[in-house]
Amino acid sequence: MKDRHRILLAPLVPFLLLSCQSAPPAAAPQSAPAATAEKPRKVILISLDGASAQTLHQLHKDGALTAGGFERFFRDGQVADRMLPVNPTITAVNHISLVTGYPPAQTGIVSNTFHPAGAPFLDTVSGFAAPIETETLWESVSRQGKKVGVLGWPGADAKGSRRTADWGILWQSDPEREPALVTLKRSDWSPMPAGAATEGLVTHAPLLRSRAIIGKEGQTGREFEFLAVDRTDDGKVNYDAILPLTAGDRVFIQPGQWAHLPCQVPRRDQIIRSTFCWVKVLSLDPDLGTAQIYFNGQYGNSAYPRTFEMTLGEEGLQWTGQADDHNLGEGWKGHPGIDLTTWTEQTERFTTYLGAALRLAAGRSDWDLILGYMPAIDDAGHELLLTDPAQPGFTTERRDALAAARLKVWQSVDRELNSFLATVDLKTTAVVIVSDHGMAPVHTKIDPNVLLRDKSLLTAGPDFKPAAGTRAYTTTSGGVAEVYVDPAAPDRDRLIADLKTYFSAWSEAGKHPIAQALTRHEGAPLGLDHPNSGDLILFAADGYTFGSGGLKAGHALMPTEVYGMHGYVNTDLRMASIYMAVGAGVKPGKPGANGVVRNVDVAGQVSAWLGLEKPRAKPE
């Protein structure tokens, strides 16, 4: 889901430029899975962001998914060979098409970031927040008298009546308190006087106390006190655990272990909230030469109505947030940060939370349709898809370690699906699992704005963003970039034609990083002929991704900051997404034509299972 360009991978090997491959033409439409006309039933539609059809079928063939979640669909339901995403194969675009049944040319959501037609020339908008020009499933189902719950689905952010269901959980990217890594040296510890906090505490070395201060200055709950404890009676000073001085039972944290500690966090409304914080001891020298303590980012639940948010808290469910990509990247560069194990544990924990929230939601009685969302597989693809020797930092050992971590993430999703299916009555409910796109390895980032600046078409401001005087600029989302030309530019049509020729022919070191440059009209067969689309639409070549940062760095090509990306033309089989269904009204076997389902047919199939008409081309 995340348009993430936040971590820098250690550039252990020079990045290599791979040969360009022209993208094939868009595939012909495939038939939808057969809709039924049976009695209405309930439907649960869950998106596993970034789940590749190729990877799913390979893992199933290898017997690597053993928890029973995915297997239930293969055994009792429908599993498509692949689902054809809409273009571009980007998160916001495909999630909106999944819940509307329309391509970007009709929804108006043409990328994760784009320039909205009619707005001031330099204005851009997030595809996750932009107005949707067609009716969505939550609108359509509500209009027809049914109830809908939405758990984090892109576009359903409750910012206006058209973006609000009957109840739901809202997606949170920004923590109330940022994650923090505290490094304590031997000089940071001092003797702990005897008192109530140490009563009955057994240690075989002097008790020492230290403090960790996290969060923003002036915030409440920033300070944590710890004791260093030696629990081994070996006649040596050998500190082996940290004891947080918090309320409740004593919790000894050894290196490599997490603890769930009582803490206080200031909410965005400045009210102090008593909650629990996840804390991990990353390392602890026996002599306390260095101790590293990591604090997970802190979030509260954001759900509606208020009674549902309270229920989440009563059930002990607390939003944990996605894994800490930034500190993983810092660790990979040799700076203080987290390791791969910690990142994977965070990803598994968030998946567990979302699975528990889905089970709680399905246990409610006030719904006919539930939309759910899990980003773990996408996160692992972006951060861990190290398969190409041309990628920064590639070694076979690192490739294998990251592959093992990606498998663990798939297996954690498998466990949650199995637990979820055990709570659902499949005699009355159809469960549908989809994804928005697959993933491909990348090694080099392209910033097209550098090329436009070099042609004197873009003026960069002090923040290295397009500023006044710019006649052309790009927005980028992975494998796709939109080029916008000022409507007031002299001889505008000729300029667009010249830029098309330039981008199509541009090369570096004999390589062509841009596979295609299409005019908006030429993008019509790809479903992209909408006023929000760029005057030119660029698709990156194999191994390349578009991004920003070049205006500051001073060059158009840079080593990529992530290992996996999407956004390429949907006929690239690596971009193929998944479609699975099981339960009421679902005929076992392969759905679609020749095992292929289209993204834009999902909303209609869900509506048919509900006994309703599909979303309309224009909202009321």
Show the residue positions of the predicted features:
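Bacterial N-terminal signal peptides that target proteins for export
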Residues: M1-A10
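C-terminal motif of bacterial Sec signal peptides marking the signal peptidase cleavage site
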Residues: L17-S19
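Bacterial signal peptide processing site
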Residues: Q21-A23
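Short, structured active-site-proximal loop/turn typified by the sulfatase FGly-forming signature C/S-X-P-X-R
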Residues: L56-A105, K147-G149
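Metal-dependent active-site segment of extracytoplasmic phospho-/sulfohydrolases and closely related
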Residues: G69, K408-L452, L518-R520, I537-L538, ...
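Short, solvent-exposed turn/loop segments enriched in Gly/Ser/Thr/Pro and often Arg
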Residues: V79-V99, L151-G160, Y373-I377, G438, ...
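His/Asp/Glu-rich, glycine-adjacent segments
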Residues: P103-T396, R492, T501, G510
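Active-site neighborhoods of enzymes that stabilize oxyanions during catalysis
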Residues: T134, S190-G195, E199-T290, Y299, ...
